[in-house]
């Protein structure tokens, strides 16, 4: 959906840019939409430096197209996410979002995938436009920890990319990887576990505890040969 929104923004801006699957997969190594625009421009026009105003305007077009596309299509959570949210809330565990995307994008997405009151499910929501540095820098996670008033070792991050994993580890937070299409080939060394979807694992509290050290992972499906 993001790739389609970028391409729609390029057309609207009168640019002959087009990001196909392979191009976008490569660009995802750079975190942040505005940063990807700059990276692509540098690779295609190395002697041209886009001004901040041009990059911001182009990214704003992309954000509008993303919101439109999300509203037009059925957007579902990844398998296991809904039950994870439900079970965590039932146990009284705090949930937070630490993302490199913008606040606007996350609102567009979760308003459709959950509902308009999605923010009530999360104790903290930190987006890429809330911090100075994006992943793989740990800034979003450090801000989440500050808002939650929790120790990093008491938390668990769920990520899908090497950059996200690096950010969590740099913040001292153990991480579980839920693989996604664009990042399947990333190096996930250092993750607690790597799964294709979250229905493969259950997070089972021991003795009713709420902290990570009082929990264990329980495999709920056979091992797969990756």
What positions do the PLM features span?
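Alpha-helical elements of Rossmann-like donor-binding domains used by nucleotide-donor carbohydrate transfer enzymes
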Residues: 5, 23, 36-39, 61, ...
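A metal-dependent, Asp-based hydrolase signature
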Residues: 27-69, 79
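Extended hydrophobic secondary-structure segments that form protein cores and membrane-embedded regions
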Residues: 24-25, 56-59, 124-128
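Short beta->alpha linker loops
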Residues: 1, 32, 53, 76-80, ...
């Amino acid at each position: 959906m993001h790739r389609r929104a970028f391409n729609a923004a390029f057309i609207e801006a009168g640019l002959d840019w087009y990001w196909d699957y392979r191009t976008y997969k490569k660009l995802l190594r750079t975190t942040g939409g505005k940063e990807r625009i700059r990276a692509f421009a540098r690779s295609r026009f190395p002697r041209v430096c886009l001004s901040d105003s041009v990059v911001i305007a182009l990214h704003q077009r992309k954000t509008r197209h993303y919101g439109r596309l999300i509203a037009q299509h059925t957007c579902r959570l990844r398998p296991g996410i809904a039950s994870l949210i439900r079970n965590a809330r039932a146990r009284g565990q705090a949930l937070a979002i630490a993302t490199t995307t913008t606040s606007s994008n996350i609102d567009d997405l979760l308003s459709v995938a959950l509902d308009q009151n999605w923010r009530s499910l999360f104790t903290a929501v930190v987006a890429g436009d809330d911090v100075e540095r994006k992943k793989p820098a740990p800034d979003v996670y450090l801000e989440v920890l500050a808002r939650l008033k929790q120790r990093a070792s008491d938390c668990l991050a769920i990520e899908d990319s090497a950059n996200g994993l690096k950010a969590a580890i740099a913040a001292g937070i153990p991480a579980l990887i839920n693989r996604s299409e664009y990042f399947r080939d990333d190096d996930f060394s250092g993750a607690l576990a790597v799964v294709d979807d979250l229905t493969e694992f259950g997070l089972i509290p021991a003795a009713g505890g709420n902290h990570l050290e009082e929990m264990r992972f329980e495999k709920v499906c056979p091992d797969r040969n990756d």
